[in-house]
Amino acid sequence: MSILKKYKDMYPDENGKFGIYGGKFVPETLMPAIAELEEAFKRFWINNEGNFREEFYALLRDYVGRPTPLYYAERLSEELGCKVYLKREDLAHLGAHKINNALGQALLAKKMGKKRVIAETGAGQHGVATAAACAKLGLECIIYMGAKDVERQKLNVFRMELMGAKVIPVFGGSQTLKDAVNEALRDWTTNVRTTYYLLGSALGPHPYPMMVREFQRVIGKELKEQILEKEGRLPDVIVACVGGGSNAIGAFYEFLDDDVELYAVEAGGKGIETGMHGASLCAGEVGVLHGAKIYVKEDEFGQIEESYSISAGLDYPGVGPELSFLKDEGRIKAVCVTDDEALEAFQLLCRLEGILPALESSHALAYAVKLADKLDKDDIMVINLSGRGDKDVQTVAKALGREI
């Protein structure tokens, strides 16, 4: 594979576009808030006013426990017939990559003088990360969560409440992540002066996709240093799961201009042909959702369809603008795996390595198992293990017909 075009630090353009994707499709009432956010991000992140970056990286080091290890999975490597490394985001504080972005944005909110932070959450991981970041930085925290997800993720709801957040269940629509985002946007429109909207993935109107990518880039930066130290060369393949896309763009970004194959693994649910899936890149159309032009799951009338996945974090009917763009460019390969394949991979990693992966990350693992057939024993594959699976044990037990 040869990279004919540079992608790193080239996008988005001044209008927040990645090719045709992205932009700012928001009501007039939110435009001042978006402009204020853009200006603040430029001041504090890009121009590093008040040593913002140093403060952020110190929090990542001392509070999150970064860098997370790059772990050589010896028994999994033997099983698959190639060298397999796991980027252990499951070992970050709170058990997922979500805290990287939550801390970055909460710190930005504080510098902007906002007192109140709102967020949406699906699996609950972003909600927990936001609640923790707000507790750490002394900010009021409100979390919107689809009523179905509240039911699926009771443990995370209680974790958020323990950290002082108020969790508001959303009963409209499909009662999942999409509806939680809608509700959070309504709140922001009403309380724009005092409130910061902390978006959980590389989605939404500009500058969010760029901001989230920048805060998650640390994954790929560490990964590049670590693999060079361990192997003396870059990996052949990096595999990451994709819901909205933040862990994937975080892992991929540093490698966009390198000769490394990048696989974005979506939720195939009960199979693409059934319509019960969350695979917008593999089976979606271009549309507008939550403030940006992206690949979405929609029906023949252009209406957004409900997504489905056994994993709450992949249960979203769209994918961020940068990944949408990179798919069209042929720079990433979009693939999907079913619930059943993810469950198999979940059990495989538990059995071979004693590591309990999140169901989201199990999708990346499941595709890695398939991909290994095409790799040689000296080929290096890195799987971004985006989170740990404690939150999913009940879901897995139920799917396997076990009472706990």
From Swiss-Prot:
GO terms for cellular component: cytoplasm. The keyword Acyltransferase does not apply. Its EC number is 4.2.1.20. Pfam families: PALP. GO terms for molecular function: tryptophan synthase activity. Keywords: Amino-acid biosynthesis, Aromatic amino acid biosynthesis, Lyase, Pyridoxal phosphate, Tryptophan biosynthesis. Coiled coil: none annotated. Its cofactor is pyridoxal 5'-phosphate. InterPro entries: Trp_synth_b_CS, Trp_synth_beta, Trp_synth_beta/beta-like, TrpB-like_PALP, TrpB-like_PALP_sf. GO terms for biological process: L-tryptophan biosynthetic process. SUPFAM superfamilies: Tryptophan synthase beta subunit-like PLP-dependent enzymes. The modification N6-(pyridoxal phosphate)lysine is found at K98. Gene3D superfamilies: 3.40.50.1100. Pathway: Amino-acid biosynthesis; L-tryptophan biosynthesis; L-tryptophan from chorismate: step 5/5. The beta subunit is responsible for the synthesis of L-tryptophan from indole and L-serine. NCBIfam families: trpB. This is Tryptophan synthase beta chain.
